[in-house]
Amino acid sequence: MKKENMAMLCDFYEFTMSNGYFKNGFYKKNVYFDVFFRKVPDNGGFAIMAGLEQAIEYIRELHFEDEDIEYLKSKGIFDEQFLEYLRNFKFSGDVYAIPEGTPIFPNEPVMTIKAPAIEAQLVETFLLLTINHQTLIATKANRIVRAAQGRAVLEFGSRRAQGANAAVDGARAAYIGGCKGTACTLTDELYGVPAGGTMAHSWVQMFNSEYDAFKTYCEMYPDNPTLLVDTYNTLKSGVPNAINAVSYTH
């Protein structure tokens, strides 16, 4: 998966404030910015920290391309010396964070950025969107896993995710929250989250009978057949046909 430069994925006021810091001599001043949240959704007791790996990768790779500088220059409001500063930008600060998968609580810092003012300001948007999204997914997944009381829970969220990155990162976050695996193949390829799944209704409908569909699938994947039993009638045909197909092939 090709990595994109996310430097410009940033609220515009981060640039206008940073320009002001530069012109007023604040850009070398070290500051501390904390990432925290105020309330756990749905009256939950705690959240599950997630998104740290992507946040750190972003900080390490953060730089501005020539076209980014030209875009900012075209706005006509940024100091030339500030734009030159951005051209040579590299994060030099320190990051302190709670490890992924750790329970976290309202109003406590889950990440602290110690850096020169401009550096701390420019990373704000990406850090918040990354930690907020993945922590939300990990927290919800953890609640479901705990409610399942030891039964395996899988993540199948890609087709309803808000974009490709949300699908991949959301599956990773669900795994951090306790899910056993995901339907998202790319998340397995990139992060090693076990990919798996059942079958689609289209597979069952491709055959002359539900039993034939199950039997063929069991023959192809005898070690771990997972059958979808609700295409026609779950109790009258799906479950009986699944039992018969598994019994026949085993």
What are the language-model segments listed below?
Residues 1-32, 39-41, 77, 83-92, ...:
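Buried, small/hydrophobic-residue-enriched core segments of structured protein domains
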Residues 32-87:
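N-terminal, Lys/Arg-enriched amphipathic/low-complexity engagement segments
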